[in-house]
């Protein structure tokens, strides 16, 4: 039955592709008139866009891994020069902005603007996923087009809205989405169109959609938890979540619209960093390896995840410092750091062409709860949540039981012996999202400074990594009338980090 559902999802995507007159997923010629295509055809395409925004080459996960010193470059490749230089100009990772607006958000907006009670579940899903993407865009860029952003057919120059105000509205939109799901559940007058095989995330389980909505709220509340002026607001919103009663995710949220080993149907991470459909290893795979720092850190803390996050060569784990300029002058000599000898991306990250594309890890949800419990509940449940976060990370990677790891007497591993509990939470979250959703650890670093003593690239001309991205060149060209002044990407922090 599972395979049948997956085939239906992929068939929906293929049908849409065959009917498109332009690019992949360009379903509606008029984004403000979504009724031209059925929502059950829009949804899997939109979700596939979400997957690609996270996992494709130069997507959110790539950016996070390079900013957070998880990934480096093998000898023989010149893959990540701009990243190692921290050359965050208007062309740097421009697609992280353009791709989401023109693809994922466009399609989710087609769902969220459907009219009629029969579409209640689809409208709610559209709004939840819009909040998911807008949240990441704010965390990356600060002020962004929001209230007018998805009306570009009639307004090609949308205004930029205040980042904190967007955050507040996103939380409200998520609350409204949960309310709409409940109202649709209880509507005995109109028969609702129920998502099923077309939903590549939860297969139409609307309780899970409510948990996901709460977890996106949780992420945003955690991000603001260092702001004294937002304490009352955070407490109020936590009470709203508790009263609603659905809780948070306890398993990883991932897109799987039927990924398989066929051409153009592989999981986007596997396709970019694993193997092509003929079984040939990709250049990205060979070019990308662990840093020396992260391998040393994992080794020194007796962390068994090392063999799952990174591939272990027959000669043992080996990493490369970011920005190394002359590989042959290292103590290993000529060819000492070629792909066959360094630790590339591991089997817990690259599982198969069929794996789901992770949007939000269960580990992060537990760590976010632990942080808020520490700050707003005197840490009454923080230890249990922290240890659940570590176990969720082990589970995703296939690394087994985590108890022996988190009970060893090591700082930032064992909750009881860690002197700085917040540092322990953020450090463990950094490890848990490594290779999976690493951009979240970059956001955490920008607001907390943890993990401490994280190296910077040897090619960097600044004392620290960027704290945001510059607005893309596409906005400079098309929306210059509303575009704010380009920020200093090293000092102009996002509002929650100030």
How would you describe each model-predicted region?
Residues 20-72, 78, 99-102, 106, ...:
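Membrane-proximal, proline-rich intrinsically disordered regions
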Residues 394-403, 407-498:
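C-terminal functional modules
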Residues 37-40, 74-129, 133-396, 418-422:
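Structured, solvent-exposed acidic/aromatic patches
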Residues 1-18:
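Sec-dependent bacterial lipoprotein signal peptides
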